[in-house]
Regions:
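N-terminal secretory signal peptides that target proteins for export/translocation
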Residues: 1-16
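Bacterial N-terminal signal peptides
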Residues: 20-29
Length: 168
């Protein structure tokens, strides 16, 4: 009887140890996945000196007047650093960063739509579509937003498809 209790006690400890190892493995897996997602975002997002959107304040676009951010008000979201013009915009971004983060990693939406290519943007050439910020290249007479506006639905579908392929 005593040896039966010892045997059952060992089995229980073995099962507990296996459960512990499984949980530990899952935790490491989740952490590794999160790091991989951040690394992918850093590789694929449009940043200069580690800062997105050419240092423009993502929240300011939604008030209709994009302004440059200040390094004093910054936030790192999933590996991407954003600057904000003031503390209020910083706090607003923190509440719902996915709302304010630009589409297609902050690259020119028109070019992502055409062929998945990533080119820099002019931070004051933008359009908010379905509540999402889209940025565009614009220099001299080459304004990609004007081209986008000619066939927005088709281009948006192409940009979504190309961006998803790049991120996965």
């Amino acid at each position: 009887m005593n040896s039966l209790l010892i045997l059952n006690s060992r089995r229980i400890r073995t099962v507990q140890f296996r459960i512990y190892l499984t949980i530990l493995g899952l935790l490491f897996s989740v952490a590794a996945s999160a790091q991989a997602d951040e690394a992918s975002r850093r590789r694929n997002f449009n940043t200069e000196n580690g800062v997105a959107m050419r240092e423009f304040d993502a929240v300011s676009y939604f008030s209709g007047r994009p302004v440059k951010g200040n390094s004093k008000f910054y936030h790192n979201y999933k590996g991407i650093t954003y600057y904000f013009a003031n503390a209020a915009n910083l706090e607003e971004f923190k509440k719902s960063p996915d709302k304010y983060e630009p589409a297609y990693g902050g690259w020119c939406a028109y070019t992502v739509a055409l062929n998945g290519e990533r080119i820099k943007i002019n931070p004051v050439t933008y359009k908010i579509i379905d509540g999402k910020l889209h940025l565009f290249y614009s220099f001299n007479s080459d304004n990609r937003l004007l081209k986008w506006n000619k066939d927005e639905q088709k281009l948006k579908a192409g940009a979504n498809r190309n961006w998803m392929a790049r991120m996965h």
